[in-house]
Amino acid sequence: MSLHFLYYCSEPTLDVKIAFCQGFDKQVDVSYIAKHYNMSKSKVDNQFYSVEVGDSTFTVLKRYQNLKPIGSGAQGIVCAAYDAVLDRNVAIKKLSRPFQNQTHAKRAYRELVLMKCVNHKNIISLLNVFTPQKTLEEFQDVYLVMELMDANLCQVIQMELDHERMSYLLYQMLCGIKHLHSAGIIHRDLKPSNIVVKSDCTLKILDFGLARTAGTSFMMTPYVVTRYYRAPEVILGMGYKENVDIWSVGCIMGEMVRHKILFPGRDYIDQWNKVIEQLGTPCPEFMKKLQPTVRNYVENRPKYAGLTFPKLFPDSLFPADSEHNKLKASQARDLLSKMLVIDPAKRISVDDALQHPYINVWYDPAEVEAPPPQIYDKQLDEREHTIEEWKELIYKEVMNSEEKTKNGVVKGQPSPSGAAVNSSESLPPSSSVNDISSMSTDQTLASDTDSSLEASAGPLGCCR
C-alpha cells in the first residue's frame, strides 16, 4: 500500500495491527471509575483470581480479564488483558523469579523505580503495579501493568515509510532519549523490539531493566544490548556515556532505510569487522583510547577505507523527497553520517540531533524540554544488597504504589472514543509483543535474546 502524508507537517499516522505494551501518562480517580462501572473499591483493589498462561500462573486483580499471552523473555511473561476499571485493553508483565539472585533482584528494583519516576509521552510509564501476596515473608510475585500498543518497530521497519513518518518516529525516539539523559539515565538497550508505536504514529521507548543512571564509573559490562545495535565503545570495552544511545538510533534509522540490519555480527570480533568494513578503520587518535590488549588486536586487523555514505545509503533506498524541503534523502543521509560515527567524541549529541534539519520540523519545546524525571534514589546503580534486602525494597515500592491506588489516584484514563486500541473489541487472538525487558529481534543469537511469539503486521497506511 502506498503511503501519503495527510496534512502538511502535521503528525503522521500508521496503520498497524499488532498489539504491544506501553504506559499511561494521565491520572484518574479510582473511586469515580469504580462507581461508574459499578465496582466497589474493595473489589477493584483486593480481590484476585488465578489463571494459567502458558507454563505460568498469573494471579491478578479481578479487574483484569481475558488474559492472553503475547510475549515472554528472561525477565518475565507479558499478557494482554481487558481492564474493567479503565475500560480498555492493557498489558500485564509478570516478573520472572525476581528474587532468584542478586542480579535479578537489583534489575527488578531498578526497573520498577525508574518506570515510576519517568513521565514523558515517548517513554513507558506504569499504569499499575501489584502483588497478590500480603506479607513480606510471602512476597514472590511482581506484576506491572502498562498500556497495550499496536506494534513494535520490528514490523514498522519492514514497511515502506515516507520521509514524514521516518522523521517523526526518529524525532520521538530522540525526545524520549533526551528525557532520560536529562536525569542521567542511559538506556543502553535501544533496539527495534524495545520501541513501540500506535496507529496514530505515537512512539514510546520500552524497558528500563538495563538502563543505568550515569555515575562516576563508566566501565560497565559490554553485554547490555542486542549485539547489532551496540556502539563501538561498548564492543571494545571502552566504557561509555550518554551518546552510546545515539549509535543505536543510527543503526535503527539505517535499518529503516535498508530494511535489513546494518551490522549483523555473529560475535564481538565479527561485529567490529562489520562496522569497520562499512565505516572504515578509525584513526590513530581513536586507537590511543583503547586498552592495550584491545588496541593490539584492533591495530592488527586488516585496514579498511570504508564506504562513503552516498554509497552506503544511495538515493534509491530512500522514499521520494517530501514536499517539505528539509525532508529528503540528502538530509536523512547527513543525519545518518553524524550518528554512525565510531569515535563517540565525534558523534552527534541528542541535542544536536534534535536540531538537525531532518528532525527539527517537528520540534516542540514541551516535548523536547520536558522537566527531567526526579530520580529519588540517586545511588540506584551503586547500591549493593543481599537478596532479602532487595526483596524488602521492592516490596516497599509495590506497597507504596498499592496504597496510592487505594487512596484514589492511579495512572491512566478510560479510552476515549476512537482510541488506537478499542477496548470494546476482543483482544487479538494471536498478537505478539517483545518483552519490554529482554526481548529482541528474530535475527539475534540465542545468547542475546529469549523467545517471542510469532509477530505479524498489517500494511502501513493512513488512519482517519
UniProtKB/Swiss-Prot annotation:
Modified residues (Phosphotyrosine): Y223
Annotated Polar residues bias: 433-454
Catalytic residues (UniProt): D189 (proton acceptor)
Keywords for the protein's UniProt record, in alphabetical order: ATP-binding, Biological rhythms, Chromosomal rearrangement, Cytoplasm, Epilepsy, Intellectual disability, Kinase, Lipoprotein, Membrane, Mitochondrion, Nucleotide-binding, Nucleus, Palmitate, Phosphoprotein, Serine/threonine-protein kinase, Transferase
Subcellular localization, as worded in the UniProt entry: Cytoplasm; Membrane; Nucleus; Mitochondrion
Cofactor: Mg(2+)
SMART domains: S_TKc
Alphabetized InterPro entries for the sequence: Kinase-like_dom_sf, MAP_kinase, MAP_kinase_CS, MAPK_JNK, Prot_kinase_dom, Ser/Thr_kinase_AS
Binding site for ATP: I70, G71, S72, G73, A74, Q75, G76, I77, V78, K93
Known partners and oligomeric status: Interacts with MAPKBP1. Interacts with MAPK8IP1/JIP-1 and MAPK8IP3/JIP-3/JSAP1. Interacts with SPAG9/MAPK8IP4/JIP4. Interacts with HDAC9. Interacts with ARRB2; the interaction enhances MAPK10 activation by MAP3K5. Interacts with SARM1. Interacts with JUND; interaction is inhibited in the presence of MEN1.
Free-text note regarding domains: The TXY motif contains the threonine and tyrosine residues whose phosphorylation activates the MAP kinases.
Name of the protein in question: Mitogen-activated protein kinase 10
Lineage, broadest ranks: Eukaryota, Metazoa, Chordata, Craniata, Vertebrata
